[in-house]
UniProtKB/Swiss-Prot annotation:
Domain of life the protein comes from: Bacteria
Species, as recorded: Alcaligenes sp
Protein's UniProt name: Mercuric reductase
Listed GO biological process terms: detoxification of mercury ion
Gene behind this protein: merA
Single GO term (MF): mercury (II) reductase (NADP+) activity
Length: 559
């Protein structure tokens, strides 16, 4: 049965209408779309249309019966509603293509949409908030907070203080948080919930999934009960959660992970940060710029896995802003007494009003019962996959942070898309040889390809050049010359194989380096390209030119 509905103004309206319709006797399930102004219902014979319109009218909207869509669309909808969401204890496809189960709703969305595009029917299972980590408690809110902190920093201090009077910004964290969360909600509705609501080939179950065997899942529904989902193919894309180190006293204290830090409506006067992960450094600087006195406890140096110059540059920038960076320092004990954290280290005690623990993320796989499906994981719980995202059980796939792939949302989405292609009969692999990475500190850190040490480890002879930003016109015009651009080439061929950059806009230049490496360009070919003058990406051209000339002796825009 189908209804046209007028008067709805948002996705929440559609949710209320759905709830009301599903309370009408005889209604098995309802799919309500605010953008389309429609409802699609699976009902028992004899269900009263008048009861349906009355239920909608009771919410202040108007509903009128509508013509059914095409036979194929109707069959797909009823197959979903009656077969997967009906009163039975089995959920499965209706025979019109493969039935794919997707566990997760963050980057897993890319896989679900690609599977539908390939002709499959999808059951998507999410135990938490639709959208996963990135949009809800990761990339999006953190970058909003970082941007707000950057604005606060520039008001307090900038290279133009001689002509623009500096001022101490008044920080209202509660208002910043409201602005941040409003954008998060907007993106979640637009890019996840709304898309799912409007796709009749995707059924969403809210609950926690575990494998019964290699062909079915048991889903403990959030609103009670359990449902069995049978599948032809399955994708595990459950992401990762903050890892907490086994420091005595830590678990008994009210510490923050990044999740709590991003939704805090207060700025602590003193913040201690355990860890030197990307998340630790981004949030440490953001809180410092919003008013906290920040101390970072780093087990080694910052960015110790990268070219040493990167860690040195960021450490210098942090210390210049008053952030304490304690290298080779670990907490052996954490106590929380009278509202104060006390961290015991080999160099004495550190006291703080709040403690952020950001030592990395662990795969969300412990509750999946992977062994029941014969799916192998490594010692850290990460699912082992091949280049086609297949697990040790070939018709079960995995992608993203729950695997041993690099923990970036764009890697997870790309892996999920390729998994969907493969599970529907295609052949796609994920090539990470030119994978960009960006850290949103200030200055930013961006890398792609080999560092010199990595190349030497793989037996590649290299040559390299490092261009400091005082040779880049954009940086000079900005009066901000912190950082450098380093190019690594294969000796002999001159082919570009790696780029490392520390610069305020490093993230905006790295994709050009990705394309150069992907297309096997030589450093001379890169130097010969036209780059817009007074852009930061022009620094790539200048760095390439340093292999054959002294750029200090060139005019500003020398070709």
């Amino acid at each position: 049965m189908y209804l046209n509905i007028t008067g709805m103004t948002c996705d929440s309206c559609a949710t209320h209408v759905k709830d009301a319709l599903e309370k009408v006797p005889g209604v098995l399930s309802a799919l309500v779309s605010y953008p389309k102004g429609s409802a699609q219902l699976a009902t028992d014979p004899g269900t009263s249309p008048e009861a349906l319109t009355a239920a909608v009218a009771g919410l202040g909207y108007k509903a009128t019966p509508a013509d059914a869509p095409s036979t194929s669309a109707r069959g797909r909808l009823l197959g979903k509603a009656l077969g997967w969401l009906g009163g039975g204890d089995k959920a499965g496809g209706d025979g019109d293509g493969l039935h794919v189960a997707v566990i997760g709703s963050g980057a897993a969305m890319a896989a679900a949409l690609k599977a539908v595009e390939q002709g499959a029917n999808v059951t998507l299972i999410e135990r938490g908030t639709i959208g996963g980590t990135c949009v809800n408690v990761g990339c999006v809110p953190s970058k909003i907070m970082i941007r707000a902190a950057h604005i606060a920093h520039l008001r307090r201090e900038s290279p133009f203080d001689g002509g623009i009077a500096a001022t101490v910004p008044a920080i209202d964290r509660s208002k910043l948080l409201a602005q941040q969360q409003a954008r998060v909600d907007e993106l979640r509705h637009a890019k996840y919930e709304g898309i799912l609501d409007d796709n009749p080939a995707i059924t969403v179950l809210h609950g926690e999934a575990r494998f019964k065997d290699d062909q079915s899942l048991a889903v403990r529904l959030n609103d009670g009960g359990e449902r069995v989902v049978a599948f032809d193919r399955c994708l595990v894309a459950t992401g990762a959660s903050p890892a907490v180190p086994p420091i005595p006293g830590l678990k008994e204290s009210p510490y923050w992970t990044s999740t709590e830090a991003l939704v805090s409506d207060t700025i602590p006067e003193r913040l201690a940060v355990i860890g030197s992960s990307v998340v630790a450094l981004e949030l440490a600087q953001a809180f410092a710029r919003l008013g906290s006195k920040v101390t970072i406890l780093a087990r080694s140096t910052l960015f110790f896995r990268e070219d040493p110059a990167i860690g040195e540059a960021v450490t210098a920038a942090f210390r210049a802003e008053g952030i304490k960076v304690l290298e080779y320092t670990q907490a052996s004990q954490v106590a929380h007494v009278d509202g104060e954290f006390v961290l015991t280290t080999g160099y004495g005690e550190i006291r703080a009003d709040q403690l952020l623990v950001a030592t990395g993320r662990a795969p969300n796989t412990r509750s999946l019962a992977l062994e029941a499906a014969g799916v192998a994981a490594n010692a850290q719980g990460a699912i082992v996959i091949d280049k086609g995202m297949r697990t040790s059980t070939p018709h079960i796939y995995a992608a993203g942070d729950c695997t041993d792939q690099p923990q970036f949302v764009y890697v997870a989405a790309a892996a999920g898309t390729r998994a969907a292609i493969n599970m529907t009969g295609g052949d796609a692999a994920l090539d990470l040889t030119a994978m960009p990475a960006v850290v949103f500190t200030d200055p930013q850190v961006a890398t792609v390809g080999y560092s010199e040490a990595e190349a030497h480890h793989d037996g590649i002879e290299t040559d390299s050049r490092t261009l400091t930003l005082d040779n880049v016109p954009r940086a000079l015009a900005n009066f901000d010359t912190r950082g450098f651009i380093k190019l690594v080439i294969e000796e002999g061929s001159g082919r570009l194989i790696g780029v490392q950059a520390v610069a305020p806009e490093a993230g905006e230049l790295i994709q050009t380096a990705v394309l150069a490496i992907r297309n096997r360009m030589t450093v001379q070919e890169l130097a010969d390209q036209l780059f817009p003058y007074l852009t930061m990406v022009e620094g790539l051209k200048l760095a390439a030119q340093t292999f054959s000339k002294d750029v200090k002796q060139l005019s500003c825009c020398a070709g």
